Amino acid sequence: MRVKIVSKPTSQLNNIIEKIKNISTKLGFEVVDKDFDYVIAVGGDGTLLRAVKQNKPVIAVKAGRRGLLMDVPVDKFEEALLRLKKGDYEEEEYMLLEMIYNDKVELGFNEVGILYDRPEAIKVGISFDTERVSVEGDGVLVSTPQGSSGWGMSATNSLLYKDLSAIEIIFVNPIFYYLRSVVIPPKPLTLRLEDKGYPQTARAVVDGEVVTLIKTNQEITVRVSQRKAKILRFFKLDLIGEVLHAYHI
């Protein structure tokens, strides 16, 4: 079996990456950069974001400051690989979002949306089914259940359980609104940068990365992808407990 290791290029991880490579080789795995069967994500949630988009099953090794979805401790990595060879694991599938703009499609694991570009409020129109609403503030994000434990939680203080079939529309620092988010079934929706009487630009973001700038009256479409992110689980993932611990609740 062939594996690819994904991690941040930091000096703090050098020894851990070397250990991961040595164990993989010892157990008969070939470490490669392409034509691989599995991805080994070593780090935290940011590393996982990159790993799941490789379109292969992911082994999530926790070696970062924050890794709510990482279940394999470094000292149990060898045990995890042995169990992989035996087929002794569970495969979890996670929702992915597609952001469509200018005939391009970007894939998101946590969230996609529109955020302000300059230090001023923007007005975002939200459309799905027969609903048409506008929210003024710092922007609007559309989050997967797993994404609600990241950026979404800092904006809403709420959590969607990881295998819930729903998406969360998050209002980022809304003006004059007490409502912080709305949870809806996984259906397509449109986000539009509305006209406030003068030209504005906003950032279209996917998993915290700016993918393009949009102008007044331009829009993006968000829908649930037919693709799923696959993470192989070897140890129990106590998501709610990890969230409480991470935020010192």
Curated annotation (Swiss-Prot):
Reactions performed catalytically: NAD(+) + ATP = ADP + NADP(+) + H(+)
EC number: 2.7.1.23
Active site: residue positions: 45 (proton acceptor)
Entry's Gene Ontology cellular component terms: cytoplasm
Compartments it resides in: Cytoplasm
Positions of NAD(+) binding: 45-46, 50, 110-111, 138, 149-154
MF terms in GO: ATP binding; metal ion binding; NAD+ kinase activity
A Gene Ontology biological process term: NAD metabolic process
Keywords: ATP-binding, Cytoplasm, Kinase, NAD, NADP, Nucleotide-binding, Transferase
Listed InterPro entries: ATP-NAD_kinase_N, ATP-NAD_kinase_PpnK-typ_C, NAD/diacylglycerol_kinase_sf, NADK
Co-factor(s): a divalent metal cation
Main location (coarse class): cytoplasm
Family: Belongs to the NAD kinase family.
HAMAP family for the chain: NAD_kinase
Purpose of the protein: Involved in the regulation of the intracellular balance of NAD and NADP, and is a key enzyme in the biosynthesis of NADP. Catalyzes specifically the phosphorylation on 2'-hydroxyl of the adenosine moiety of NAD to yield NADP.
Stated name of the protein: NAD kinase
Organism whose genome encodes this protein: Saccharolobus islandicus (strain L.S.2.15 / Lassen #1) (Sulfolobus islandicus)
Upper classification of the organism: Archaea, Thermoproteota, Thermoprotei, Sulfolobales, Sulfolobaceae
